[in-house]
Structures are given as C-alpha cells and as structure tokens.
Design a protein with these regions (language model features):
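Gly/Ser/Thr-rich active-site loops/lids in small-molecule metabolic enzymes
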Residues: 106-125, 190-197
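Glycine-rich phosphate-binding/hydrolytic loop that grips phosphoryl groups
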Residues: 5, 76, 187-211
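Glycine/small-residue-rich loop that forms an oxyanion/phosphate-binding "nest" at active or ligand-binding sites
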Residues: 47-82
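Active-site rim beta-loop-alpha module in soluble metabolic enzymes
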Residues: 113-166
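Gly/Thr-rich phosphate-binding beta-strand-loop-beta motif of the actin/hexokinase/Hsp70
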Residues: 1-17, 82-103, 120
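Short loop/helix-cap segments at secondary-structure boundaries that form the rim of catalytic
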Residues: 13-16, 29-32, 45-52, 97, ...
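N-terminal beta1-alpha1 ligand-phosphate binding loop
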Residues: 2-27, 40-42, 174, 180
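Short glycine-rich phosphate-binding loop at a beta-alpha junction
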Residues: 33-44, 166-175
Length: 211
C-alpha cells in the first residue's frame, strides 16, 4: 500500500520508508495499478484519478478538531501527524499552523521562498539574486544578496518564533530542510503529511472495530 499527497505541482508518494516526488503524468503512468490511498489539492485532476479503481481518495477522513471549512486537506494531514506542536510546510507557500492537545488553534500563510525572490525580481533586475541558504541572522548584511536573504528568512523566523511558545517545531516541504536550519531544535521530516494520513486511517480503523 502507498500513500500519496497530490499537490498542484507534484505527486508525492510514500511507501512507508521513502518519499518519492513525481510529475502527475509520470505517477499515473507508473503506479495506476498499485493500491494507493491519496489526498489531493489539485482539483483538475480529481475526475481523472477517481476513475482509477485501485486508488482511494481519503481526503474526507482528514478530520481535525477546530479546522475551518476551507482549510487545505494537506494542511489538515500535516497537523494530524502529532497532537501538539507548530507545523510548517515550506513549499510554494509557507503554511504555519498551531496544534494544542489535538485541536487546531489557528495559523497563517506566507509566500514561499521562491515567491519572495520573484517579488524582489519584479521590482528591479538589480534585486534578481538567489537565496543565501547560510546567511547569518546575527549581523547586518553587507551585500544585496545577503540583504535580501536576511529579509526573507528573518521575517519568516520572527513570525514563527512569536507563536512557537516552547512548542516542538515540525517542518516539512521542499524548502523545509533549508528553513529548519535557522531554528533551534526544529524537527525536519519529509514524511509528516503521510504520518498524519496514516494516523487518520488508524483512527477510523479503531472506530470501525468498536462498532
């Protein structure tokens, strides 16, 4: 059995040990005969993949106490991975959500690292730089590249630290490893969303056995 998190850009597949990143087309061609339990935020794909008999949409099973109606199913799954903590998914956008005793307390959304860089590029070609993944946050920058990198990372870190309040910080997503390096005792885990999905399935299985 595989678990899949189908995003807007990529198809993320988990075999219980390893996370595999594929294009939507590649995933359908290669895994259409496999038994897959998935969540999907790319609505344009739903009709096509719902016709694959061995694939099962479990989005409705991502039940998170306190979640608001339009909250993304991938965010719900991430927050179901642990009963307490602050959860960050650093992808195209950066989502930050707080969980206390299994209940959703609220969260916020920031642009992703690439979106920040694109915003700078749109202002001036002089600001078209790559991110310095090792920029120091303990001293003021002396170059344009470091100034932009500092502005991006420090603004994200300041907001997350404000709401952390001693909670364990869990980080996932394509830019998660980079972002986690700027926090003390952050837990980077590429499989957090899948662990939340599995927890939701386990809860349903337990409830079914009680009936």
């Amino acid at each position: 059995m595989f678990l899949a998190d189908i995003g807007n850009s990529y198809f993320h597949l988990f075999d219980g040990k390893t996370v595999i990143h594929l294009s939507h087309k590649e995933a359908i061609a290669k895994y259409h005969q496999e038994n897959i339990y998935y969540i999907c935020v790319k609505h344009a794909l739903n009709e096509k993949i719902s016709s694959i008999p061995t694939w099962h949409n479990i989005s409705i099973k991502m039940k998170l106490a306190g979640a608001y109606r339009t909250m993304g199913v991938d965010r719900k799954a991430l927050c179901l991975s642990h009963r307490e903590g602050i959860f960050v998914d650093a992808g195209s956008a950066i989502t930050v959500d707080v969980i206390e005793k299994g209940k959703y307390m609220g969260g916020f959304i920031l642009p992703g690292l690439n979106a920040y860089l694109q915003a700078y590029r749109s202002i001036s070609g002089v600001l078209d730089v790559s991110l310095n993944n090792a920029v120091s946050l303990h001293e003021l920058p002396l170059t344009t590249k470091d100034g932009i990198s500092y502005g991006i990372i420090a603004s994200i870190k300041t907001l997350i630290d404000k709401h952390r309040q001693g909670k364990t910080l869990y980080i996932t997503g394509g830019d998660g490893k980079v972002l986690s390096s700027f926090f003390e005792k952050a837990v980077f885990d590429e499989a957090l969303v899948f662990k939340g999905m599995q927890n939701a399935l386990d809860v349903q299985s337990t409830n079914n056995n009680k009936q």
